[in-house]
Amino acid sequence: MKLLKKPAGLKKRKVISKRIKIEKKPSSEDEGSSDEEVPKLDGEGSLDGSEDEDDGTVTVEKGGVKKHKLDLEKLKQSDPEFFKFLQQEDADLLNMEDDGDDDEDDDEDDEDEEEEESDDDEDDEEDDDKTKIKKIRKPKIKSDNSGRLIVDSNVYSYLQQVLVLDDETSTPTNPSDVRMAVDVFVACVARVGADIEAPKYVINEQSIFEAVVRMCFQAMPDILKRLLKAKPEGDKVLFSKTAIKKYQTYVRTYLHAMIVFLNEVQTTEVLIATIKAMTRLVDLYAHFSRMSKLLIKAVVRIWSRKTLECRLPAFVCMNLLVKNYPQHFVPLYKTAYVAFVANSKIVTNETWPLLQFMHRTFAELTILNPEQAYKYAFVYIRQTAVHLRNAMISKGRKDLIFSIYNWQMMQCMYMWVRVIAKAHSVNGAEQIGELVYPLIQVIVGIFKLCNAPTFLPLRLHCCQLLIQLQASCTNYIPILQVSCDCLEELARELKSKPKPVKGAVKLPDIECTLKCSSQFSDLPQWRKVISEHVFRTMMQSAHLLASQAAFPDVVLPINHRISAILETMKNGDHAHLFRGFQTKLKEHSRFVLDVLARKSVDINDEMQVRAVRFDLNNPDSPIKTFYRQWEKVWKMKERSAVENSKKDDKKKKKEEEAAAAKKRKPNETVEDEDDVKPEVSKAKRKRIKIGAAAKKADASVPDQFADMSMWSDED
């Protein structure tokens, strides 16, 4: 452009000089050639021998044209380079054509130069429609004593007009406004209490802080995607590489600020809103490896520690990241497993639903990429087997035994049972389904590690794990034999006389207990609870085998063993309970034998085998009828137990509140009770009398009358 501007100036000067020569032509020549006209070009007015400055036309007579041609020939001989330039740049001048006044040409050239300069200053991403849009003036931002800019209502309204757009397709995104919004959000993060460097902006009002955070959560995901020229491709979103390189500094700043904000806030509503906003930015987080690692740590922390309302959106974010970007599966899977183990040490009635939620969601993550998950599932199950082997060969070392008999180990077993059960119900996860065999061996090994009666609740948990595996994987597991071991331990405990206790005793929940202390083991209430859970285990295991043709053969040794155990059981109530179960086993054995006797079954014929299974799966069979009746009674007992625990919790809260109210000192005296003086010791009276008034107001104490304008005379 610089090379073109200099000849343009020369061109204008030459044109003016030639026109002056034409105008000085004698009048005699002008009169003789006034009848002929030069033809009209490019929409200009007719050349009638007069010069009109208003309409931009110039009239030249015949003699003037000849003189002009002679001058051009002389110019061609004297300065051929300039003549060649005129041919290339202004051929109309050589053809005696004029495009308008010189002043208008100058104005047009100036406008072209201004447009070129403005185009050079604009960013590559801005659209051509920007000149048609009204420009929003930036407000004047005040600064505090430290030099930081204060975010007030004017700044917020400006950002809202710029970021929250009605027409998202045609309106361009200004990078400077996005940078300003990122800096303002960093100020919000600093206000929350994050340990970061002093930001460029500062927010002093709580209302402005909440409004800015809400606006950023709502608008920034779409703004950043538009700035980076996001293009959806299936479930993924691709970004322009040039835009990523150009704007990655403050895109990274915003993504990191979101993670810091998530780690600092504690309110459930704010946590949920933050996770939802970050879920919309998963595509950006996945693009940056370091940001994705920080996102995984932050989201997994909420998935494993917070309330159920917060864990659900956290899992949605985890699932979306792993599903669309499989390269992040391994770090997330390992982080989630470690977080689960670390946060499963304590199990109560309140934490059981949270742990079960983690079991289900971890199984869902495993099914998303079963090939990668199999490697780590195998290693983790093998690790539990190594711990079990060390405890078995330790010859009774308590520290190694308790490394197995704890809630972390049992919760890992519950989780892997859920994972393998899920794998058996999904196509393509056969590798994980094959891990059922080592898992069964580990659970049975945990069951047989220690036969002490204090660990009877843990052994019942092992039975429940085996029941879940058999129900979901259709593999035969000798659960009835294992449950008979529990019945033998119960019979040993029942040999000793129970210790009666006066009044009501709150027993520990066996679902949240692995070890029974000696103070409860001798109580008749506890023995009753244990016998009911042993009966439940035997009922469920028998119900799983009810539709199998091998039921009589499996149950025959179990009946003999139960009879031998009941002979040693002195308590009549417990013996009566298990004798009823034994009679039902015998009745169902006869039912199965009758069904098999009525039909001739060829094992190689699949249709005959299915017909026999259909007949054995009769809902009116003895075991299934007895199971339905028992299940109704069991659910009623569970409901009553839950209601009683809620009532006890309410009573405890009321008692605690009453005790706290008694301890709390009254801050104000009531006018009606002025005559009644509380009993105060003499030493306290002396202290009250001697105490001096404060000389100066304490500035550190917040003003408790700040909302006095909201009061009324009636209050």
From Swiss-Prot:
Residue spans of biased composition, Acidic residues class: 89-128
Disruption phenotype: Worms exhibit slow growth and sterility caused by germline proliferation defective phenotype (Glp) or proximal germ cell proliferation abnormal phenotype (Pro).
Record keyword Nucleus present: yes
Positions of region (Disordered): 17-71, 85-132, 638-715
Listed InterPro entries: ARM-type_fold (IPR016024), Noc2 (IPR005343)
Keywords for the protein's UniProt record, in alphabetical order: Developmental protein, Differentiation, Gonadal differentiation, Nucleus
Localization annotation: Nucleus
SUPFAM superfamilies, alphabetized: ARM repeat (SSF48371)
GO MF annotations in UniProt: histone binding; transcription corepressor activity
GO cellular component, one term: nucleoplasm
Domain of life: Eukaryota
Biased composition (Basic and acidic residues): 638-660
GO BP: any one term: ribosomal large subunit biogenesis
Protein family according to the UniProt entry: Belongs to the NOC2 family.
Role summary: Required for normal somatic gonad development and for regulation of germline development and proliferation.
Protein name: Nucleolar complex protein 2 homolog
Organism: Caenorhabditis elegans
Taxonomic placement: Eukaryota, Metazoa, Ecdysozoa, Nematoda, Chromadorea
